[in-house]
């Protein structure tokens, strides 16, 4: 039986720095990238493009199973490509976000997307960014990281990010939203946000991104070496 491509899962709460870390890892290692958080938005956009009814689970399942999506890494950003078109900005619209929330409620759609996500596991390897990558999607991943940071630090990062883009934002409101989202994510019935038992927990609160990257790469080298030796 041929050996499967290695997977590194990066899970954690919103604002912990997963996206930046995954982009750097994919660039450094030359591995494929899966942004699971974008998958439902991409499916929603595909449904809108193809006039598929958002309340028809039966119509959405085959669309999910055959979703033509790629995540392309370059030095500036991760491009989300649907059917050959860069949709990185389009999937962030409110219309697509609302549609994504609606279709995510269908169990058979979730199951189809689970299989689609697992199909990203190709040589030379996969960096999987999400919230349940190491616990649900790739429980057999060779390297599992849970990237965390205090709610205050994550709110501060988001505050600076939005300010730099010219938005007028309230820090206390951001902090409240992050705490509420954490509570929802950690206590939901299906795939709650939690570190896999065999994950390395990295608290990035007082670390630079370079320090986080170095820590993860050193751990990955150790784990992948152990996996190839066993």
From Swiss-Prot:
Under Gene3D superfamilies, the record lists: P-loop containing nucleotide triphosphate hydrolases
Source organism: Aeromonas salmonicida (strain A449)
Q: Which GO terms describe its molecular function?
A: ATP binding; CMP kinase activity; dCMP kinase activity
Keywords (A to Z) from UniProt: ATP-binding, Cytoplasm, Kinase, Nucleotide-binding, Transferase
Localization, UniProt: Cytoplasm
Name listed for the protein in its UniProt record: Cytidylate kinase
Kinase among the record's keywords? yes
Give any Gene Ontology cellular component: cytosol
């Amino acid at each position: 039986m041929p050996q499967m491509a290695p997977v590194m899962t990066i899970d954690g709460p919103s604002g912990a720095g997963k996206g930046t870390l995954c982009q750097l890892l994919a660039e450094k290692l030359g591995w494929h990238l899966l942004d699971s958080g974008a998958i439902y938005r991409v499916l929603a956009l595909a449904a809108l493009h193809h006039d598929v009814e958002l309340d028809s689970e039966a119509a959405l399942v085959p669309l999910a199973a055959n979703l033509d999506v790629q995540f392309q890494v370059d030095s500036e950003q991760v491009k989300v490509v649907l059917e050959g078109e860069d949709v990185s900005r389009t999937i962030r619209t409110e219309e697509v976000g609302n549609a994504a929330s609606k279709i995510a409620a269908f169990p058979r759609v979730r199951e189809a997307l689970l299989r689609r996500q697992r199909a990203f596991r190709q040589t030379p390897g996969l960096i999987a960014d999400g919230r349940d990558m190491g616990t649900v999607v790739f429980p057999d991943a060779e390297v599992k990281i849970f990237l965390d940071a205090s709610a205050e630090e994550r709110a501060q990062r988001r505050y600076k990010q939005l300010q730099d883009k010219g938005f007028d934002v309230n820090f206390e409101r951001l902090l409240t939203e992050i705490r509420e989202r954490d509570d929802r994510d950690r206590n939901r019935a299906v795939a709650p946000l939690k570190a896999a038992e065999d994950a390395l927990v990295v608290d990035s609160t007082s670390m630079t991104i370079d320090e986080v990257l170095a820590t993860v790469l050193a751990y990955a080298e150790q784990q992948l070496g152990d996996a190839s030796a066993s």
